[in-house]
Regions:
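Conserved SAM-binding loop of SAM-dependent methyltransferases across substrates and taxa
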Residues: 113-124
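N-terminal juxtadomain amphipathic helix
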Residues: 1-83
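Conserved SAM/SAH-binding beta-strand->alpha-helix loop
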Residues: 133-135
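Conserved SAM-binding strand-loop segment of SAM-dependent methyltransferases
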Residues: 144-159
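Conserved SAM-binding motif I beta-strand of class I
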Residues: 126-131
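A short, conserved alpha-helix within the catalytic core of class I
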Residues: 179-187
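A conserved beta-strand element that flanks and buttresses the S-adenosyl-L-methionine
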Residues: 169-172
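Conserved class I S-adenosyl-L-methionine
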Residues: 103-112
Length: 187
């Protein structure tokens, strides 16, 4: 298998220490959501090894598949899950309760088919999705959810600023964040 298709992590994904302990080798596995039942032997397969950092105890996979392989054509759609659609409305209501600015702009990174942006749009908020899956962008567009296709990076941020025609800060309601932080320390 080509090394451009995946890389083996040498450091912990959380603490960056080089103390990875191999736990379970699950052999070569097809990508989730990419199973081709007609020709299973043609499915791309990648090593799947579970390891644990001896330092911070985080259990993680040892191999990282190239994101383009994983996400440029993505098959699962958020809208297929009744629970996700229901939760998107609850999530929207909760986030709106934290907002302290007029005319907020909602940006969802990894927006999939736009399901989580729909409730915000229905409330009259400006929304934009960013997702690398080229096959999901048309689905979002049909739902009148604007989307930029690509991996979230500086280039995408520049596109967003250009689309909005002004520099915009994405802020996290500082006042509420501080009170949540204080509350979590008290618990």
């Amino acid at each position: 298998m080509k090394s451009a298709q995946y890389k083996v992590e040498k450091r912990c994904r959380i603490c960056s220490k080089k103390k990875l302990l191999n736990l379970i080798n699950l052999g070569n596995q097809p990508l989730a959501n990419r199973l081709n039942s007609k020709i299973p032997k043609k499915d791309l397969k990648f090593p799947l090894n579970l390891c644990m950092c001896k330092d911070c105890k985080t259990v993680q996979i040892k191999e990282t598949v190239n994101p383009k392989i994983l996400f440029e054509k993505y098959f699962w759609q958020t809208s297929t899950s009744v629970a996700a659609r229901r939760f998107s409305k609850i999530f929207c209501k909760k986030i709106i309760s934290y907002l302290e600015c007029k005319n907020p702009f909602v940006l969802e990174i990894a927006s999939n088919d736009g399901t989580f942006l729909i409730p915000f749009k229905e409330k009259g908020l400006e929304v934009l999705g960013v997702d690398p899956a080229k096959n999901l962008a048309p689905i979002s567009s049909k739902k009148k959810i604007p989307v930029i296709t690509g991996f979230f990076n500086k280039k995408i941020v520049k596109k967003i600023i250009k689309i909005r025609k002004k520099k915009s800060r994405l802020s996290f309601c500082q006042k509420r964040y501080r009170s949540c932080k204080k509350h979590s320390r008290d618990s």
